Amino acid sequence: MLLSKYFLPVLKEEPSEAQITSHKLMLRSGMIRQQAAGIYTWLPLGLKILKNIENIVRSNMNKAGALEVLMPCIQPAHLWMESGRFENYGKEMLKFQDRHDNTLLFGPTNEDMITDIFRHNIKSYKDLPKNLYHIQWKFRDEIRPRFGVMRGREFLMKDAYSFDINEENAVKTYNQMFKTYINTFRDLGVFAIPVIADNGPIGGNLSNEFHIIAETGESTLYYDKRFKIFKDNPDIDVEEIKSWYAASEEKHDVNKLPISEQEITSSKGIEVGHIFYIGSKYSVNMNALINDEHGKLTPVEMSSYGIGISRLVAAIIEANCDEKGIIWPSSVAPFKVSLINLNIHDSKCTELAERAYKELSAQNIEVLYDDTDVRPGSKFATHDLIGSPYQIIIGPKKAANNIVEFKNRKSGVIEDIKIGNLKKLIMSCLRQQKSCNF
């Protein structure tokens, strides 16, 4: 992509309305623009990141055998009345009436609707298990939306719902999804800790939240120090990880620790995923019954699995930034490489830049080629801000000798590279980052 053709409205100054780092950087880098309180338009750069995260989440769900569906944003209120949640959910639910006086709502979650779909289409234990998921925009009328997309009113979620014949099988499915979540966050290039948590208004009696460690997090987490080993060695078996202690502040009890207090550490975290074993709460209330192997009607056992995709964008920034801007993990970066031509009027600079752009694009490497006619300092500031993992910097002096500068955005290390060796180096770096995005 040529920067001269791209829509990238970067801001030089910090927006006064932004309180946290991710909100500031998302506005400054031209990822989003606010349309109303807690409601944002995603501009091209932000949308690319959102789609990259969405595709990684989708890929891992598909690998786990889940099947994608798409439920509507707008839901009939009668389903929520039937499940018993309509009056209890509170003012966060946006309700309205259509021209026929039917009460509708903008869905904040989908347990009620997916239960309705299940009960009308699956009747026998032979059709189980099933795991259905969708990726859809949701709305919660937050009383005080803040922190940009971290706590907005409109947000993109991946929600999955599993159905099993009994509790034993439901817990097996839950454990499989626990592993899927660990693998998903690995692939996203983030370090997420699974903590024991409350089920909240969803219901049920088994629950884990997944938190990205960040100083700006709202939650305090207490966890086994071995999680730090996991961060440095992501190949540790998931079964081993599942046995390690980790709890939210609400669930942490120093009098009931399975390990010594000296083996525990604490950090602030940002919740980006939550999984629940619900049991039969919705199936009983909504009469979602199946014939078991003895011909007896029994309520189906359910679990729910959510990942906040738009929230993840902000959380990843909070955990991956410096004073200059964002440092994207390679897996979610909108562009893997920023190609910076410092002098578009110098024929040698342009020759090397166009050669690099052509060679890398031929390898399906996403490159943002800065072919704009602005001063070098402005170019450096823009590309450090938007956070491509690697930068190729081409200036007249070194270009005369077929040399370019190669910068690792995360480490800040810059080295001189012969133009003929550039493609091989970048492909090697991207492979290494893919194997360990931390």
Curated annotation (Swiss-Prot):
Q: How does it assemble?
A: Homodimer.
Q: Does the UniProt entry include the keyword tRNA processing?
A: no
Stated EC number for the protein is: 6.1.1.15
- Please name the source species: Rickettsia canadensis (strain McKiel)
InterPro entries (alphabetical):
aa-tRNA-synt_IIb, aa-tRNA-synth_II, aa-tRNA-synth_II/BPL/LPL, Anticodon-bd, Anticodon-bd_dom_sf, Pro-tRNA-ligase_IIa, Pro-tRNA-synth_IIa_bac-type, Pro-tRNA_synthetase
Q: What class of enzyme is it?
A: ligase
This protein is called Proline--tRNA ligase
One Gene Ontology molecular-function label: proline-tRNA ligase activity
What job does this protein perform? Answer: Catalyzes the attachment of proline to tRNA(Pro) in a two-step reaction: proline is first activated by ATP to form Pro-AMP and then transferred to the acceptor end of tRNA(Pro).
Q: Which UniProt keywords apply?
A: Aminoacyl-tRNA synthetase, ATP-binding, Cytoplasm, Ligase, Nucleotide-binding, Protein biosynthesis
Gene3D superfamilies, from UniProt? Anticodon-binding domain, Bira Bifunctional Protein, Domain 2
